[in-house]
Amino acid sequence: MADNIRTTPLRLRPSEHRMILFVGDLLTAIISVIAALYTWRQYSNYNKTIEYIADGLSQARIDRILSLQEPFYLQGPFWFLLLPVIWMILLVELYEPHVAGSGRKTTRGIAIAAFIGLLAYSLVFIFSQETNLPRVGVGAFLLFASLLTLGWRMLFIRAYKSTGQRRRILLIGAGMAGQTLAELYQSLGTRSFNIVGFIDDDIKKIGKKFHELPVMGSSDRLLQMVDAYRITDLVVAINGEIQGATFQSILDAQEKGVDITRMPILYEEMTGRVPIHHLESDWIIRSFVDEVRVSGLYELAKRLLDIIGGFVGMIIFLFFLPFISLAILINSGLPIFYSQTRLGRGAAKFTIYKFRTMRQDAEQDGEAKLAEKNDPRVTRVGDFLRKTRLDEFPQFWNVLRGEMSLVGPRAERPELIAAFQKQVPFYRARLLVKPGLTGWAQINYGYYASVTEMSVKLEYDLYYIKHRTLPMDFQIILRTIGTVIRHTGR
């Protein structure tokens, strides 16, 4: 068997692809800064660049900044140091698999990032002096960053879609689990890999197609299929015990250099969700009891982030408070706020406060009702507050108190949780972590008005609980900021 081992090209994991993209984007941003400084120097027609940087970093300038005589964020050298960071923040949504592998979506994302960057700089331009900001330099940076990032991303997509990197997948099992993957493959239009078809021992299924993918044969022909169709990955999509002959064929394929993956792993990669309807109880126990524990260092860092974010959020809240209060008062009268009891980590009860966005009689019968898209109970001011997430700002107080986190599943009412846990499997697993102001489910899915939609949102929540890290928390926060800027909230 060892003589038949294939020499397979080096293939990278999705997380490694994202790391390569991040490093490439950062390098192009740094190169763009250098090119922008050079362009500004040439445009100025004299060697002003070195003088500009030297003046900005001089002891006298630093002393004025430290004494609060000059705001540091309006100083040119600091702006140029921050430009790569700001650009990377604007690109955060381009790391999603369905975007990173698409030239059209990548081009659109870079164009939006450049537009937002130009708009933000235009606002600063109004309040700055000519000597504070090198306007030609910043404009040149946006141009260079857009073109270089686009060029680098197109090269990456071309390499990513090459035969050496593009996986060819064969699904083991044409039952509900396998068909779910096939349906996702067709609906998402992903082309970061090819699903060739199914292998199944059910004679009645052989020769049929499910979601345009054929059942190509039984497991006794697995090795032949692997060679004939240059299969790189086998995805086991069988619920229950794998039969001995099928199991041996899978092991033989692994010895030939084929990667073996379980259905839930590919599902997570494709959707950013956990397939709750295709999991067995022992898998849930392993993933959400044993592996769900994270390091104490992460918990400490997350709490520190919550405290800092809570203070910043409260400052912003106090700034907007009189304006929002006046708008609500004029539009729909009192009260300005409303409060509710929610369940936190470990089912602990606490009270949240939000700006009121619905009519006073939204739940006059006292029965909890789910919010809907274009909900008629939402006021005009409330619609704006929801789209910009400003209605959530009073909850920064809950974050400071430790009842909530900046990032986590949405906090729900006890009566809704009691109802959902009877209909949706593993629903109470959401209570393993603190609820959040924003979260993986909130940025990826809108309103839910049915049990089916609730299940999808739960799949996002459980994915976050399983994979939560500080980089993921930062990604969610940055995408939420983008939602606020674009007014695309729920």
Predicted segments, located by residue:
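Membrane-cytosol interface motif
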Residues: I110, A114, Q165-Y185, P335-M358, ...
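N-terminal hydrophobic signal-anchor/signal peptide
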Residues: M1-T28, S32, A100-K105, G151-L318
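Signature of alpha-helical transmembrane segments in polytopic membrane proteins
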Residues: M1-Q165, F193, R490
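Hydrophobic alpha-helical transmembrane segments in multi-pass membrane proteins
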Residues: A29, V33, A113-S122, G310, ...
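Short, glycine-rich, amphipathic interfacial segments at transmembrane boundaries or analogous
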Residues: I203-I206, Y267-E280, I284, Y338-R380, ...
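A hydrophobic, helix-centered structural microdomain
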Residues: L297-A362, N398, L470, Q475-R490
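C-terminal terminal-structure detector
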Residues: L57, R401, E415, K422-R490
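A short, structured surface patch at a secondary-structure boundary
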Residues: A371-K434, I476-V484
